[in-house]
Swiss-Prot record:
GO biological process: maturation of SSU-rRNA
Organism: Shewanella amazonensis (strain ATCC BAA-1098 / SB2B)
Functional summary from the UniProt entry: One of several proteins that assist in the late maturation steps of the functional core of the 30S ribosomal subunit. Associates with free 30S ribosomal subunits (but not with 30S subunits that are part of 70S ribosomes or polysomes). Required for efficient processing of 16S rRNA. May interact with the 5'-terminal helix region of 16S rRNA.
Keywords, comma-separated and alphabetical: Cytoplasm, Ribosome biogenesis
Molecular-function GO term, any one: ribosomal small subunit binding
Gene3D superfamilies cross-referenced by the UniProt entry: 3.30.300.20
PANTHER family: RIBOSOME-BINDING FACTOR A, CHLOROPLASTIC-RELATED
One family name in Pfam for this protein: RBFA
Domain of life: Bacteria
Assembly behavior: Monomer. Binds 30S ribosomal subunits, but not 50S ribosomal subunits or 70S ribosomes.
Protein name: Ribosome-binding factor A
Family that this chain belongs to: Belongs to the RbfA family.
């Protein structure tokens, strides 16, 4: 049974690579634009695959439009990938926006901002004269 899971994982990794190639080179839909395939989760019976993608866009409406275009083009992408992979059953593709990368970047920026603010506060505290010391002109 563990072998079955490793097979689905291997197929998911290969599917991720092939989809990334197909989306960059063979898909000419201008609505999709630049897309990154982050992960592919394949079901045990290989009938379905969830494809997690990110875009270089932050506007939620643009992201939804690109995701809708990808899901509309999913059968065509499936056909192109099926020609590149040797599987008896090619999973149906469902594209899902992966917000984890964006959230990770947002959290990293927040941590960096807090560190900068903390260092700025420490710098101001160190500049103040202590008791018994006077400022020299």
């Amino acid at each position: 049974m563990a072998r079955e899971f490793s097979r689905t994982r291997r197929i998911g990794q290969q599917l991720q690579q092939e989809l990334a190639f197909v989306l960059q080179r063979d898909m000419k839909d201008p609505r999709i634009g630049m897309v990154t395939v982050n992960d592919v989760d394949v079901s045990r019976d290989l009938s379905h695959a969830k494809v997690y993608v990110t875009f270089f866009e932050e506007d939620p409406q643009v992201i939804e439009a690109k995701l809708a275009a990808l899901n509309t083009a999913a059968p065509y992408a499936r056909t192109l990938v099926a020609g590149r992979m040797k599987l008896r059953v090619m999973p149906e593709l469902r594209f899902i926006y992966d917000a984890s990368l964006v959230e990770g970047m947002r959290m990293s920026n927040l941590v960096s901002k807090v560190i900068r603010d903390d260092e700025a506060k420490k710098g101001h505290i160190g500049d103040e004269p202590q008791e018994g010391q006077r400022e020299e002109d």
